Amino acid sequence: MSVLYKNFTQCLIKNNASIKDAMKKMNDIGKGDKIIKNYQFLLLVDKTNKLIGTITDGDIRRSILRGESLNSSVIKATNMNPIYGLEKEYENNNALLNSILHETFFLPILNKNMQVIDALVSDSSYLNKNISVLLMAGGFGKRLGNLTKNTPKPLIKKNGKAIIDNVLDIINKCNLVTKLYISTHYLSSLLKEHVNSRIFKFPIKYLYEDTPLGTAGSLSLLDNKLKENNILVINADLITNIDLNNLIDYHNISKNDATIAVAEYTYKIPYGVIEYSSSGSFLELIEKPDINKFVAAGIYVLSPKFKSLLSLEEVIDMPDLINRGRKNNLAIGVFPIYEEWSDIGSPEDL
């Protein structure tokens, strides 16, 4: 079913805005509106409200992967060839939107002057696919030293709050989650006691690893009936405010078998770096440059095909599983995180 979005004007953004402006506006437009909360988009218009293009969360993230700065023009993150409907043609517009649900979940409505006058939104988009979550919480946390001697790493507190509670909060906010699996090993009883004290919208099942199976091996312990469902795998030692709905939608619309969430990491080389040609001729000396790289953020969406690549209780880490999928010609994409993200790897991170 499709509905007209009465407050569509909050989705309009002018063509002099930046990508950063678009990110903020997209995060703001869903507040207090049940329809748009889970389907955020922007309509790029000129000063007379003529449609220039459309922008989704995925468009913004793809622009980041292309190397665009957040201060770049929003046009760099815009679909400049949008599909649109026409004024007073509700039946045709509804049919058009239904025919393109494999691409998008909304349809700008224009008048004869190509000005935006409305927006049609589907509340039955194919993107709304349910998903199960596997929370990886069985590690020893050795890098934290004595802090994890009697406490599992996910229960270590940062700013007065257990690390795992941050992850559980974003999982609980995701309206697509139907079941949560939690992989445990080290001090599992303490972990279960803490998690069981919380309230969730979905059932929880604990998977106990008799011996550590690596960062991906517990996928082999999941119920066989999940062979038709995607699995979201997330580490229990992250601090992030990512909206998991956006990640899952990105995975589905990209038609990936695996989507790896990545975060930008910057490190400084403490020396002058020499640039030179293939013949050995000097080109440039750069003093202590900053290097930016995308790193795996400990969050993945995997299709059932990845579970089929595992044998029961196989010991394997996630990089090896992802590379195995690559060798089997599975489609693997990346999802850049621009939201808050950090990994608790040392006492200094607390």
Residue ranges and their predicted role:
Residues 1-11, 17-20, 72-82, 148:
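Bateman (tandem CBS) regulatory domains
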Residues 11-39, 45-46, 64, 84-104, ...:
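The conserved cystathionine-beta-synthase
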Residues 37-39, 43, 50-65, 102-104, ...:
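Short beta->alpha transition motifs characteristic of CBS
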Residues 65, 132, 161-235, 246, ...:
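Conserved N-terminal catalytic core of the sugar/cofactor nucleotidyltransferase
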Residues 121-150:
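N-terminal nucleotide-binding beta1-loop-alpha1 segment
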Residues 140, 236-238:
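Active-site metal-binding loops of divalent metal-dependent hydrolases
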Residues 232, 239, 245-252, 265-268, ...:
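Catalytic-core segments of class I nucleotidyltransferases/pyrophosphorylases
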Residues 254-264:
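A short, conserved acidic/glycine-rich loop-to-beta-strand motif
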